[in-house]
């Protein structure tokens, strides 16, 4: 190719060459399984949420007297509005399902270990942003569960010493959840997804700095192939399966993952018998409720994210993949079962025996992160790379 042809080649242009480097020619370990397809699925979910959210915002009115009716207007009067709303509402659930599977895959294969510490920490930040975005989005329909969920969760900020009450007043825009709160939440709910896009691009760039982990947990620069067409085709299978799964929820069970009380307009004078957040918040909500003291519950929630952020810095792991670490593998499955149990406890009333079960489950959750550094020293498996001859004993 001549110098002139190189200059006008599409793949030599700055933007297209960057896309080609990261999405086409990106060297990928040849043994990646379908568990590595959830990253691209998460990106698809984010795009779905942004596109449907933009169209919903065209018809939504962020006012306490009109918000609930505007949602019903979307459902009844806007052409295709019911589809937009169900895609957006169930899309949030699909997004969290994909991300939870992505996180647990990372835990199982120790994708957080060196040199991918920054990738994992960015992922935790993205997860936290998702939680905040989903919570404030759940408030926007202004139903009973929206209003009382906002009241309960935002009041938790009052547990912060010195500045807690000031933060709550700032969040509310007054002395109670009202019109100012709804306007603030709508504005933030529109903004945060675009911040999520930026954080996701940073996450992808950080991943591509050192390359993807693999099921064996070993590092090699030799056994790699181009991402396109091999893993595009492999991811396509996951995309089709996801589309079928997503469609079943949208067309056959659009309200199963929601709460019926949210079809009742918000009434500050009537408290629901049982305030329950969306299902994807339930494990964290159960940990919050397991501690009677408000400040202790908030501290426990903060500790959850601190544990996740600290996980890559437990410098004690000689072997990454759980396939070669039977003790850690058992602890991983215990953690997964414990999180499912916490999710069930989160939707139960605050009474015996659910409180006790929640406290025990919360303790097991934190014990996993306390024991992980010790488990890294137990057992001996394959080396860090094909050429690593270092004796770790």
Curated annotation (Swiss-Prot):
- Indicate where this protein is primarily found: mitochondrion
Q: What Gene3D superfamilies does this protein map onto?
A: Cytochrome Bc1 Complex, Chain C (1.20.810.10)
Residue positions annotated to bind a ubiquinone are 208
One Gene Ontology cellular component:
respiratory chain complex III
- Cofactor note, please? Binds 2 heme b groups non-covalently.
One example of a Gene Ontology biological process annotation = mitochondrial electron transport, ubiquinol to cytochrome c
UniProt-annotated binding residues for heme b b562: 88, 189
Membrane-spanning regions, if any? 34-57, 81-108, 117-141, 179-210, 230-252, 294-314, 326-346, 354-370
Q: Where in the cell is it found?
A: Mitochondrion inner membrane
Give the Mitochondrial matrix membrane side ranges: 1-33, 109-116, 211-229, 315-325, 371-393
This entry's Gene Ontology molecular function terms read: metal ion binding; ubiquinol-cytochrome-c reductase activity
**Membrane-topology descriptor:** Multi-pass membrane protein
Sorted alphabetically, the keyword list is: Electron transport, Heme, Iron, Membrane, Metal-binding, Mitochondrion, Mitochondrion inner membrane, Respiratory chain, Transmembrane, Transmembrane helix, Transport, Ubiquinone
For the Mitochondrial intermembrane compartment, the record's topological domain ranges are: 58-80, 142-178, 253-293, 347-353
Report residues binding heme b b566: 102, 203
Q: Which CDD domains match?
A: cytochrome_b_C (cd00290), Cytochrome_b_N (cd00284)
What InterPro entries would the database entry show? Answer: Cyt_b/b6_C, Cyt_b/b6_C_sf, Cyt_b/b6_N, Cytb/b6-like_sf, Cytochrome_b, Cytochrome_b_C_euk/bac, Cytochrome_b_N_euk/bac, Di-haem_cyt_TM
What are the required cofactors?
A: heme b
tRNA-binding keyword on record: no
Further remark? A stretch of 270 kb of the mitochondrial genome is duplicated within the centromere of chromosome 2 resulting in the duplication of the gene. The expression of this duplicated gene (At2g07727) is not demonstrated. It is also probably not RNA edited and therefore differs in all the positions known to be edited. Heme 1 (or BL or b562) is low-potential and absorbs at about 562 nm, and heme 2 (or BH or b566) is high-potential and absorbs at about 566 nm.
Its biological function?
A: Component of the ubiquinol-cytochrome c oxidoreductase, a multisubunit transmembrane complex that is part of the mitochondrial electron transport chain which drives oxidative phosphorylation.
Similarity field:
Belongs to the cytochrome b family.
Subunit:
Component of the ubiquinol-cytochrome c oxidoreductase (cytochrome b-c1 complex, complex III, CIII), a multisubunit enzyme composed of 10 subunits. The complex is composed of 3 respiratory subunits cytochrome b (MT-CYB), cytochrome c1 (CYC1-1 or CYC1-2) and Rieske protein (UCR1-1 or UCR1-2), 2 core protein subunits MPPalpha1 (or MPPalpha2) and MPPB, and 5 low-molecular weight protein subunits QCR7-1 (or QCR7-2), UCRQ-1 (or UCRQ-2), QCR9, UCRY and probably QCR6-1 (or QCR6-2).
Task: Indicate what this protein is called per its UniProt record.
Answer: Cytochrome b
